[in-house]
Structure formats: structure tokens, C-alpha cells
Amino acid sequence: MTTDTANLLVGEGWRDSIEALVRDRMRGLIEEILEEELREALGRERYARLMTETGAAVEKSQGLGEEVTATAATVRGHRNGRRERDVTGTFGKVTIAVPRARLDNGDGTTREWRNKTLPAYRRRTKEVEALIAGSYLSGTNTRRVGRALASVFGRGGVSKDTVSRAWRKIKTDWEAWNKRALSSEDIVRLILDGTVVRVRLDRRATAISLLIVLGVRGDGQKVLLAVRSMGGESEAAWRALLDDLIARGLKKPELAIVDGAPGLEKALVSLWSDIPLQRCTVHKLRNLIAHAPKRLAEEIKADFTDMIYADTAKAVAARRQAFLRKWRLKCRAVADSLEEAGEELFTFTRLPPSQWKSARTTNAIERLHEEFKRRIKTQTVLPSAETAAMLFWGLLASGQITLRKVDGWRTLDRQLAQPIDLAA
């Protein structure tokens, strides 16, 4: 290590240098994107000009050292200087030189060019707004949020008024999302599950349930349909949530994947009496293990996994019978618990095998639960029930978590096959 390098690493100066370099690179990148957008709008490179009304002109483009040709047919306006705008992102606060231009309307008049990279009045990226709102939702007041985030965005980058505006924007988006129409959504499958969080209610820490509904579109894409804070996972709680979705246009799905909670299943059947249900196999495995001594846990898991992950529907059915025969003798409670689940635990076998992985569990929601709780693990209690739901929604709305297509989505249009008759 050289003396200069050693001196640079003393104190915090090296961090400031790196952060300044990152901000400078981001500023240059944003300005280049704006330039490219304007070049496409004008139909010519910067500094290229027409020498005649009908012919083509050739001129050196500044800094490029190459010839640029522009014709009367391609030129659609002219540049009109620049203006500076401050933008705050996760990289900090930078000042951008935004190009200006006038575009021809074709009738002798012009209009101001508006870029799409930095929409008018946007001073912060969506990620920053989500970070600000998330800090506020976590129970920190506006002034403290501003002070806490000053180390990220620079002194004065996030005022309490900025926090308030970001919060109001998130609140407005949240309310609109909860009222949006669902009639145009091509939902063919539902995945439903709940998770418990602790919130402050009447000045006391109280456990509530967050009820989550994911939808699967006909093209396989998963979408968040609802997240609602409730006192528990009763039939009434789930029914209220589902009634709201139906009132906004949700159509009957072809399959519902559930965690096995009796209240949820009753709510679904009360709305759609013949809807096929798939009980989560992961939840059921936990339930089976709970019915036996701990020393048998690994053996139960091995037998259950061998059954559920068999290659064909017939193989699953055969291993199901073998599981029941063995555990009726070894631990009757385990066999009784599997029988209690009934055919709903094996609905996935009526689907094309390519869909089995995504159809037999509620893991799509479980992963969201895990990520949500990882984000809030430093807080033992959230400020309120509503903010808990908003925080969960905000992780997806801000793009911090993305949902992908389900496995086997190309075969989603196939109908469920008839269940295998175990008595045959």
C-alpha cells in the first residue's frame, strides 16, 4: 500500500471520494440518456444542421469526430438550451443539465419537448420515495426521517416537508390501489395465505393477521390482488376480503391454493361451492410432524416427500396408500391427519406435471412473508394495522420485490383432470 493510499484510507475521506465518483457517473449516465432521447425526438445528432431546404448537409458533431447527415424529412425541431434540475436517488443528490427543445407541429407552430426520463416535477426516484415512506410508516416522525436519511442523500436533501409529500403520495396510491377495478384482470388461479404481525393498538402491542391474496393471470404472471389487516383468519375475515374483490370485478378462478386454515376454505366454498382447492403440502407436512414424537420427524418428512414428489399421479396415489398403511401402525395420529386433508392435498396431480411445483404450495406468498419480516425485524411492534398492510404492499409497488411467472404457465389453459380413484 502506498503512502498516498494509506492517507486516503485514514478517516472517512475515502468514502466521500467514492460516493462523489458514483454520483458523477450517475449524473453523466442520466444526461446521456436524456441526450439520446432528444436525438430521437429531433431526428438528428446534436450540432447537425440543414444547409438547404431539400438537400442534405454534413457537419462534424462536437466531440464525436464523425460526420452527421440530416435531411429536411428527418429534422423535427430545434434545441433550446438547457436547464438544471436536482434529482435525488439512492445514489444521492445530483444536479442534471436537462436539454430543452422545440418540436415542429407541422403547421408552422412549435411545442416544448418533454422528456420521459425525468417527468416534469419529479425530483426523487420511486425507490427514494419508497424508502422515505417506509421510514415514516415504520413509526418515525417526519423530522427524524429527514435527519436519518441526510447521511444517504446529503444535508438538506430530505426535509420534513419532503417526507410529508412522499407520505401523502404513497397514501394516495395505496387508497387508489385498494379501489381499483379487477374486471379486466384475467385471473385463473388464486393463492391465499395469512401471516401474523405485531402492531400498536390502543397503546398496547397486539398480534393481528395480514391476509394476502395473489392472483395468477392466464399468461402465468403473479400479481398482488389484496393485502388486508384483520384480527384473525376467521371465515368472516376472509369472506369480507373476498367479497370486496368480487365487488370490484374478480371472477371465479379455476383453482385456489390455500394454507389449510378452515376459515379460509369455508369462505371460498361459501362463494364458489365447486371451486377446486389445493391445500399447501408444506403446511401439511408441518402439521403431520406436530402429531408425532420429535424422534419421528425426519422419517415422516422422508415418507411424505417421497409421496408428494413422485413423478406421476399414479405413483403419488400408490405412495399415499403406502404412507397410510405404515403410519396407521406406527403412529395413528399421523395417518389420521393425512386422511383429514383428503383429496384437496392432491389436487395438483390433476394438473400437467409442469405445473406441480407452483401449484402444490403457497410458497409464493411464504417468500413474500419472509422478505417482509426480514425488513421489519428490527421493529418488535409496527405503528398500526394499516401501516403494516401498506408496508407489505409498498415492497411490491416500489419494485423492491418482483413477482415472476408461475412454473408451467404455458399449460395453464388445460382443464383439471379427474382425480384417481384410490379404490379402483
Specify the residue positions occupied by each region the protein language model found:
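A short, charged helix-loop
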Residues: M230, L288, E299-M307, D311, ...
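Amphipathic alpha-helical transducer elements in NTP-driven molecular machines
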Residues: R15, E19, R23, R27, ...
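RNase H-like nuclease fold core
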Residues: R79-R82, K93, P99-Y121, E127, ...
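Short, flexible loop/hinge motifs at secondary-structure junctions
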Residues: M1-S138, G146-T172, A176-V188
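Acidic/histidine-rich catalytic cores and adjacent linkers
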Residues: M1-L8, G13-W14, E36-R39, R44, ...
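Conserved beta-strand -> loop -> alpha-helix junction used to position metal-binding or nucleic-acid-contacting
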Residues: L255-P262, A267-D303
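Short basic-aromatic helix/loop recognition motifs at nucleic-acid
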Residues: A133-T140, W356-T361
